[in-house]
Amino acid sequence: MNLACKLLASFLLIFFFSSKGAVSKKNITILGALERDINLDIPAFQMSEHVEDIQWSKGKTKIAKFKNGSMTFQKDKTYEVLKNGTLKIKHLERIHEGTYKVDAYDSDGKNVLEETFHLSLLEMVSKPNISWSCTNTTLTCEVTKGTDFELKLYLNGRMIQKSPRKVIVYKRASNQIASFKCTANNTVSEESSSVVIRCTEKGLDIYLISGICGGGIILFVFLALLIFYISKRKKQNSRRNDEELEIRAHKVISEERGRKPHQIPGSTPLNPAASQPPPPPSHRPQAPGHRPQVPGHRPLPPGHRVQHQQQKRPAPTPGTQAHQQKGPPLPRPRVQPKPPRGATENS
């Protein structure tokens, strides 16, 4: 009997202390997503008439109080205590990470519940972006946001690669038609993208085609501008050449006009004998001053010859006279005195 009583007493003591510790304190870890709302639910707790006051605190700072069915204290609008005692935190940010504690009291002010929560926040993953190249037979899966996530790549429903990094690069064996799915997930979120790739062996990559088209357009614009520039330069050069030819023509004409002597109309040449035609070859040259005798004509005496020559010589025109006066004065012929008639007859 004594041994049985001792065993029973030991069992009751162990159960009492263990149950008391479980009710009094629990450290619960909760993961939340940034920019989302979260509820801190009290496990195995149900509101009753005996519970009068519920207080929530973060660290040593009281943030909310619920008493007699209504909110009596609220640090800011981010925190709210629901009717079942749950704490709701709106639009989570990094400052909301930490340890939260809840205490429940009955009408006598006795603490009937005490729980502790540790809140950790994670960034939600973004939707994966899948890109590929038919030329290089490569496929890339990439995410831009997320913490503590895992990236997985599936080919025709079968997982072929996974990585904790933000990028997965997969080298395909051929350009056959294939279905790919990329999934990114962490504890608080999950996103996925799917694509069906159709590449032919002799096909061109869309980026290569776009590059060729863009290069052709740039080349066409360059050639058009070059042709326009060349035609414009040709027009300017032809116009300049025409102007130079016109200036040269005016210059030549003005020089030719300056070289020609100023002739006065009605003037006679200085040497009338030079303008006369040469005598026929049958005529022999005669001595100067000898004139052919006409039959039946009597030669005049020397005095009469001089007078006769002076009468036959035409009077110089004003233009010729002016032209002759420019040079040195010409010698004037001597006029022999007429011999008396008696002397001529006696001789």
Swiss-Prot record:
Q: Where in the cell is it found?
A: Cell membrane
| Membrane topology, record value | Single-pass type I membrane protein
Q: Which UniProt keywords apply?
A: Cell adhesion, Cell membrane, Disulfide bond, Glycoprotein, Immunoglobulin domain, Membrane, Repeat, Signal, Transmembrane, Transmembrane helix
Boundaries of each Ig-like V-type domain copy?
25-123
* Signal peptide range: 1-24
What is the protein's name according to its record?
T-cell surface antigen CD2
In this record, what's one Pfam family?
A: V-set
- Residue ranges, Cytoplasmic side: 231-347
Which stretches of this protein does UniProt put in the Extracellular compartment? 25-205
